[in-house]
Amino acid sequence: MEDPDICWVQRFSNFERTFLLLSKALEFESPSVIERAGLIHFFEMAFELSWNLLEDYEEQEGITAKTPREVIKQAYQAELISRGHDWMNALQDRNLMAHTYSKKTAIAVEAKIRHEYFPLLDELYRLFKTKLEATK
């Protein structure tokens, strides 16, 4: 069986790459339709990897949660994340954008990514970057 430590470290590496791409995509202040679609896609990927990262870390800590909602709730209770309600909103918007597309919704979600969801992912990134440094 794979060492759980290795599992979350590998997941963090994948999350970090996608998070940094999302960060770059956010540099476009007035994105075109294509740039906005890319930004939303990077958010979807980063969000998916964020809850997978939390799931791997929680498993290492002896916490069992399998759905994104359960993982987020457990992470909030364990104080790995703050603003649990905002994480749940991000999950809802990620699911919405994965299954539907409208320009109006895309613009609204882009604004939420910029002002609400990216800061959540940034906080998670910084936490796990620190945890990774502590393992070296």
Residue ranges and their predicted role:
Residues 1-136:
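Solvent-exposed interaction patches of small proteins and small membrane subunits
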